[in-house]
């Protein structure tokens, strides 16, 4: 094995990198640590300023905030070609964050790279594997017992390779990042689609797949297609029942689930100052639901206040010094502008089954009656990475306190998920948690829980039609409880609390009355609560594991008989030929999210074992041939069976296959398993009308061909019984379409064109069999 420095030098030479950037290089003008946990890793505002000035001089125009932060992290700002929506940028992120469900595969890939240490500050957060059953402490103990093997792997891998480890119970990754790691101007990538949460603190924080994280941890420049910038101008101010959540619910209704694809959403305008820092994080977090690359707010006094309250006054002071680089230039141009008057914005509730179906709360009851949606609310759930801040808990408690004063409790079941151990300890100290319990709530563990399907729900049977209301971010079919008949709606935590007390979608807290225990009618007043605790946060229990300075003796063991973890085998290289006679595994009808492609919930336990988790491949996708989920025709036997079984049959018999998809294929989570699984089971290409950004990149990273119909109507020319040949791979080049020959069973053929977004580097991934294979080639 070559020394680490030599490996890095070889990689950089092969990739054309001029200088190896490490975040710990000392600042010229100031030395402020990126976090309390990494005292020798410094914020590089001086480098950000230098790069911004180089790019501004080249482009000769005012820059948006998004451009400042992104271009400020260019690997080669003097020579990088920059064109929004077209060129690929080579960037140097400041840090990497991984949650436990995706960190398993990311760390397995990093181990395969052969590198001894991560090159940038990185952390692992245990939040996804804790199932909600009865309550916080018992659920946490159960999760530690069930997931001991995985937690031990992540802890020892973190110690071995220099990655900080947040133990189970510490909280949700995005809340931990906001409290400890995000700062104005940071470029952070995370292996979770809601990483944009950090935009609430003025950073560009982007969700990626594990293979992208491996690149950054290996010290390789990270590639991102130069994003467009959508400006959202906020005027007026929030008041009454209207909350930050309503801003993004409104934006989702305007832009839809794919309207932000390929763009950063940048909020600006005088209305920004009426929103708390954690409220801005809520808005940025749910920007993932419109397909945005990320979202961001400009640095302001709210962020300064939050930094100071979370023990980072030194960062706030440094940000003040560089403030001009942390806000947009006057006169900067956006690719699209949306204007929202916060004075006129009403409380919203979105759903069911998609986060962009927006309704004012005042109207949803009427719409539900018309559509036949269940009006009675079975469960109200507050928390999640989107809405679990101190302010969120305080506003919900303010609503609950009014109900208690009139002798009322929740008519619906009611659960509360604190965002972090710090939030849990602080709301316990300040009495909010007890108020929420008194109104009928159950406080769950500091984890994702029901939001990602980690919910052992007992009150209904699968297939039973029912309604739940959450303060979460996603409400895809079956996501929360694996029941396709659960009508899930997303709204603010205070609206969830009010609706859980009333027990019906027909209740409008702005106008409707409740009847107290004494028989008297009363109206809930709009909640008011502190955005931050008046005294310091209570940190609660210490849940962080520092990586040791010397890890030379650290072992990382993966049992060959484990059902949870599996070392990776390299994927096969491209054989240099066109892809002939591909069988169609499934032609997908309609929406196909990463939840449909690789379900979460009970499958999370297999996230570190590629072969086992591949048994959930596309089990949620609807087959256009019969309108059913997880039922496809085996082209050899002509029998219908589960998608994974059919894929395994094809792999065993040497039959290569393809998936045909609809619009925005792969929207939702960043989980790269949705790309690893089809590759592992013999897939070669995914052909759709359009892709979600993260999933398209993940497919490329694993050596698959994500292709789009040059004419979207060609989707209708392909039938599940056809065979496809993809031609032109010997001359595969950026911007050059590939040909697809459709071979029908009756002997006729049609030829169509397929577009792609591959650049030269990504084409090398395909030829090598995967991005990881290519990395290994460059080490030799």
UniProtKB/Swiss-Prot annotation:
Enzyme class (EC, first level): lyase
Catalytic activity: citrate = D-threo-isocitrate
Residues modified to N6-succinyllysine: 31, 50, 138, 144, 233, 411, 517, 523, 549, 573, 577, 591, 605, 628, 689, 723, 730
Domain of life: Eukaryota
Main location: mitochondrion
Region (Disordered): 524-560
Pathway(s) annotated for this protein in UniProt: Carbohydrate metabolism; tricarboxylic acid cycle; isocitrate from oxaloacetate: step 2/2
GO cellular component, one term: mitochondrion
Range annotated as the organelle transit peptide: 1-27
Molecular function as annotated in GO: 4 iron, 4 sulfur cluster binding; aconitate hydratase activity; iron ion binding
Keywords on record: 4Fe-4S, Acetylation, Iron, Iron-sulfur, Lyase, Metal-binding, Mitochondrion, Phosphoprotein, Transit peptide, Tricarboxylic acid cycle
Obligatory cofactor(s): [4Fe-4S] cluster
BP GO terms, sorted: citrate metabolic process; tricarboxylic acid cycle
Binding site for [4Fe-4S] cluster: 385, 448, 451
Comp. bias (Polar residues): 551-560
UniProt: substrate binding residues: 99, 192-194, 474, 479, 607, 670-671
Subcellular location(s) of the protein: Mitochondrion
Name this protein carries in UniProt: Aconitate hydratase, mitochondrial
Species of provenance: Mus musculus (Mouse)
């Amino acid at each position: 094995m070559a020394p680490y420095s030599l490996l890095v030098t070889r990689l950089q030479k092969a990739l054309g990198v001029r200088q190896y950037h490490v975040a710990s290089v000392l600042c010229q003008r100031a030395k402020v640590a990126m976090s309390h946990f990494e005292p020798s890793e410094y914020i590089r505002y001086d480098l950000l300023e230098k790069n911004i000035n180089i790019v501004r001089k080249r482009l000769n125009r005012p820059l948006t905030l998004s451009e400042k932060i992104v271009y400020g992290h260019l690997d080669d700002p003097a020579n990088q070609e920059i064109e929004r929506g077209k060129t690929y940028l080579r960037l140097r992120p400041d840090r990497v964050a991984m949650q436990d469900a995706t960190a398993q595969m990311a760390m397995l890939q990093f181990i395969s790279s052969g590198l001894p240490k991560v090159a940038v500050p990185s952390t692992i957060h245990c939040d996804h594997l804790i199932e909600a059953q009865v309550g916080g402490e018992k659920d946490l103990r159960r999760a530690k017992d069930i997931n001991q093997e995985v937690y031990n792997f992540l802890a020892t891998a973190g110690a071995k390779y220099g990655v900080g480890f947040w133990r189970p119970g510490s909280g949700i990754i995005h809340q931990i990042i906001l409290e400890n790691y995000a700062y104005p101007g940071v470029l952070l990538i995370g292996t979770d689609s809601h990483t944009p949460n950090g935009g609430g603190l003025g950073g560009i924080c982007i969700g990626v797949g594990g293979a992208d994280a491996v690149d950054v941890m290996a010290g390789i420049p990270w590639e991102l297609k130069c994003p467009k910038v959508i400006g959202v101008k906020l005027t007026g101010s929030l008041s009454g029942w209207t909350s930050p959540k309503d801003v993004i619910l409104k934006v989702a209704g305007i832009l839809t689930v794919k309207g932000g694809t390929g763009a950063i959403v940048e909020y600006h305008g005088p209305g920004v100052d009426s929103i708390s820092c954690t409220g801005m994080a809520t808005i940025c977090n749910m920007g993932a639901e419109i397909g945005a690359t990320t979202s961001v707010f400009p640095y302001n006094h709210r962020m300064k206040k939050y930094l100071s309250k979370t023990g980072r006054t030194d960062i706030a002071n440094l940000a003040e010094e560089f403030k001009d680089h942390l806000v947009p230039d006057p006169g900067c141009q956006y690719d699209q502008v949306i204007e929202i008057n916060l004075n006129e914005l009403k409380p919203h509730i979105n759903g069911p089954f998609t986060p962009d179906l927006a309704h004012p709360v005042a109207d949803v009851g009427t719409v539900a009656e018309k559509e036949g949606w269940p009006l009675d609310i079975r469960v109200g759930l507050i928390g999640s990475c989107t809405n679990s801040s101190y302010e969120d808990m305080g506003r919900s408690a303010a609503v609950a306190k009014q109900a208690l004063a009139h002798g009322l409790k929740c008519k619906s079941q009611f659960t509360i998920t604190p965002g972090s151990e710090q939030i849990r300890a602080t709301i316990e100290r300040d009495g909010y948690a007890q108020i929420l319990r008194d109104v009928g709530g159950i406080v769950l563990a500091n984890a994702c829980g029901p939001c990602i399907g980690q919910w052992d729900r007992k009150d209904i049977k699968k297939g039973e039609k029912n309604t739940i209301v959450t303060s979460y971010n996603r409400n895809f079919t079956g996501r929360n409880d694996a029941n396709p008949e659960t009508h899930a709606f997303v709204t603010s935590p205070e609206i969830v609390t009010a609706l859980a007390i009333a027990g019906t979608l027909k209740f409008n807290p702005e106008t409707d009355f409740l009847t107290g225990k004494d028989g008297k009618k009363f109206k809930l007043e709009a909640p008011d609560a502190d955005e931050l605790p008046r005294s310091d946060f209570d940190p609660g229990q210490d849940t962080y594991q520092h990586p040791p300075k010397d890890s030379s003796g650290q072992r990382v063991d993966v049992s060959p008989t484990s059902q949870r973890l599996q070392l990776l085998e390299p994927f096969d290289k491209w054989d240099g030929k066109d892809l002939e006679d591909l069988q169609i595994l499934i032609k997908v009808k309609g929406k196909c999210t990463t939840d449909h492609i690789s379900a979460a919930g009970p499958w999370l336990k297999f996230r570190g074992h590629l072969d086992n988790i591949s048994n959930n491949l596309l089990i949620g996708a609807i087959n256009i041939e019969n309108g059913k989920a997880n039922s496809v025709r085996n082209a050899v036997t002509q029998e219908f069976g589960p998608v994974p079984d059919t894929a395994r049959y094809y792999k065993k018999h040497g039959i290569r296959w393809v998936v045909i998809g609809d619009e925005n294929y792969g929207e939702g989570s960043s989980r790269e398993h949705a790309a690893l699984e089809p590759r592992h089971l013999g897939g070669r290409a995914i052909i759709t009308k359009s892709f979600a950004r993260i999933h398209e990149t993940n497919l490329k990273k694993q050596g698959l061909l994500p292709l789009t119909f040059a004419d979207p109507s060609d989707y209708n020319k392909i039938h599940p019984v056809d065979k496809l040949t993809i031609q032109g791979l010997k001359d595969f080049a950026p911007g050059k379409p590939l040909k697809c020959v459709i071979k029908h069973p009756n002997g006729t053929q049609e030829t169509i064109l397929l577009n792609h977004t591959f650049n030269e580097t990504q084409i090398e991934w395909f030829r090598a069999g995967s991005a990881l294979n290519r990395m290994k080639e460059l080490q030799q």
